[in-house]
Amino acid sequence: MAQKEGGRTVPCCSRPKVAALTAGTLLLLTAIGAASWAIVAVLLRSDQEPLYPVQVSSADARLMVFDKTEGTWRLLCSSRSNARVAGLSCEEMGFLRALTHSELDVRTAGANGTSGFFCVDEGRLPHTQRLLEVISVCDCPRGRFLAAICQDCGRRKLPVDRIVGGRDTSLGRWPWQVSLRYDGAHLCGGSLLSGDWVLTAAHCFPERNRVLSRWRVFAGAVAQASPHGLQLGVQAVVYHGGYLPFRDPNSEENSNDIALVHLSSPLPLTEYIQPVCLPAAGQALVDGKICTVTGWGNTQYYGQQAGVLQEARVPIISNDVCNGADFYGNQIKPKMFCAGYPEGGIDACQGDSGGPFVCEDSISRTPRWRLCGIVSWGTGCALAQKPGVYTKVSDFREWIFQAIKTHSEASGMVTQL
């Protein structure tokens, strides 16, 4: 169990506090149960989680949008803006990008359970980040509709055993987890969004750690000493311009603790290296949902880093509770959230920062893991009423998409608001 004497609140990486998990006894798992996701617009199913209102067919890649007024699924009528619509649709579902798109004809491909069409308002399309805001029911006289293949994410390629809390994990279980190393030493965790982009915490890159040629990204292994993992260099780091400690070293405001790392070349996607999904647009966390945090950080506050990747399941705590006087006393801002047990015992610690907090759902029919949080900061490790604090990824979806599109050719340290 991670322990700390005293109560100073510090970033998880204050001496690079990067994602590592502390072992402890899991209590209350059964009592807490698995809470469901709250979705802005959904199709309720009696036996499963709500479906997200934008779907892509696994059979022929057709895009389908739910008409909540009529209670039916509709196809997207093909237009001159198919590339933009395909990309926006994939992003809305939590995929990083559309890989390809095409047209299908309803007369030959069939309706396959859908009923009618939506058309896109192409004039409004450049000014929106939500497909649902720019579509309306239409006739689609040509009967041609849009299909898209989104970059796959959030799925393991190997069968794995279930492990509960604060223990060594197995190869391929969390294939999006990477280690960010500076001069060969593990400093932070990170999550693969694609073969060449990693999402992590901004505080992993203070002034003293900004020589990019000294950074390496290690992937495809669970043991830090494994000879089988892959290491790649870093081309650029894009960090949030609103992360105040980079402007004022005395600032204790930890909002906007998020950064993207662009690799010097793409990692090959294998059974052990896979990207994680982002939250879908409008998808919100529900208090009490039990999710998983992983990392190689310290197993105790004053202890050593874990040699093998650790994992632990912890519940999300409401911001109202976490801002209470006995917890963090109004330090939890809207773009943060807490996760852990009030009694402590299981938590992220130094060496865990920047690492993934992931939750599984079935809102896209296929079960997928989504990156809901980034290990950010906390008081000590695994202390009672001092749970880990995470950057809320759902509030940074548009920042992520824009940063990747804007800075794909950049090099060095780059800032983006």
UniProtKB/Swiss-Prot annotation:
Originating organism: Homo sapiens (Human)
Recorded superkingdom: Eukaryota
One of the record's GO molecular function terms: peptidase activity
Glycosylation: residue positions: 112
Active site: 203, 257, 353
Domain annotation SRCR: ranges: 54-151
Membrane topology designation: Single-pass type II membrane protein
Protein name (record): Serine protease hepsin
Segments on the Cytoplasmic side according to the record's topology features: 1-23
High-level lineage: Eukaryota, Metazoa, Chordata, Craniata, Vertebrata
Extracellular side: 45-417
